[in-house]
Amino acid sequence: MNQLGSGPTKQGVATNTGSTGTTKNNSNLSGKGWVL
């Protein structure tokens, strides 16, 4: 996984629907998007 320094991205938001999306969602709320 690659961490993005900017705000939530489309890739990061998309992970919210995944099985691991709940853990990644916390990072998105912190202003960090994740790309799987």
Curated annotation (Swiss-Prot):
Region (Disordered): 1-36
Chain intervals with Polar residues compositional bias: 1-14
Source species, domain of life: Eukaryota
Annotated Low complexity bias: 15-36
Protein name in UniProt: Putative uncharacterized protein DDB_G0295823
